[in-house]
Amino acid sequence: THCISSAASDVYKRQQYVNDENTISFPWSMIDKITPRPADTVAESLKEAGVEDMDPVITSKRTYIAPFVNAEGPQYLVIEDRFPNGRPQLEKAGVYMTDRDTVNKVERMKVTTCLNPLHTALAVYGCVLGYDLIADEMKDKELSELVKRIGLVEGMPVVTNPGIIDPEKFADEVINVRIPNPFMPDTPQRIATDTSQKVGIRYGETIKSYVAKDGSARALTAIPLAIAGWCRYLLGIDDNSEAFELSPDPMADESVSYTHLRAHET
């Protein structure tokens, strides 16, 4: 009985400690830096530059590790400034220190308007059109115009502005610097993973904002085209009539069944 009481007392003390905001905190954060798995092309480039032992390794869990990291130059780290015991001057390293509401706004800006919706559009159309690299898709005038319209034309009128980062400049960097980066070997197949879990957030929030603002989302054309592209992708046949493997998705069976049903109806 004494042991049980002692254990219960310890648990209570720990709970009190964790719940005391003057003692400990759990700041919210948002990080944005595209970092795909290590690519053989990057390893080869490093070898040509005289750097040895750069070969990526596939682990027993099918994850990829390497002595190098594929990472882009632009990076954003936004942290809720709630540290009751003090903190380093993270601002000097380029970290945005702000309040919780602003962290959420930055996340919403990125996920619903300025980056993720563009990525998903390129992912589904990239698979259908036979692309292996996201960067190469930006050489296609129609795909490039599609993502510009999604982000800059349709997204900006209802974008969440966090104040600490300018949405238009952020989106412009995404479109003109980050996505076209030829040294960022990201694939449409990777980004197409779990699309059923993403569509509602990446496009639905903008659609809802238009309805709330104008009473209708009929002004949108690029966003519906991106969603239609996902439905086309779910058929699993590219534009050369060749079958391709769909990326992993927890609702793949349901999504594919519905898409095939609707395709037969039309």
Q: At which residue positions do the language-model features occur?
A:
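Primary mode marks residue(s) on the alpha4-beta5-alpha5 output face of response regulator receiver
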Residues: D10, Q16-N104
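Conserved phosphate/anionic-ligand binding catalytic regions in large, soluble enzymes, centered on
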Residues: V111-G126
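Single conserved hydrophobic/aromatic residue that forms the stacking wall/gate
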Residues: T1-A8, Y12, H260-H264
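C-terminal catalytic subdomain
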Residues: Y125-E254
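Active-site-adjacent structural elements in folded domains
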Residues: K105-K110, Q189-T193
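Solvent-exposed loop/linker segments at secondary-structure transitions
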Residues: N104, A121, Y131
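A general structural signal for short secondary-structure junctions and capping/turn motifs
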Residues: R14-D20, I65-F68, N104-V106, T112-L115, ...
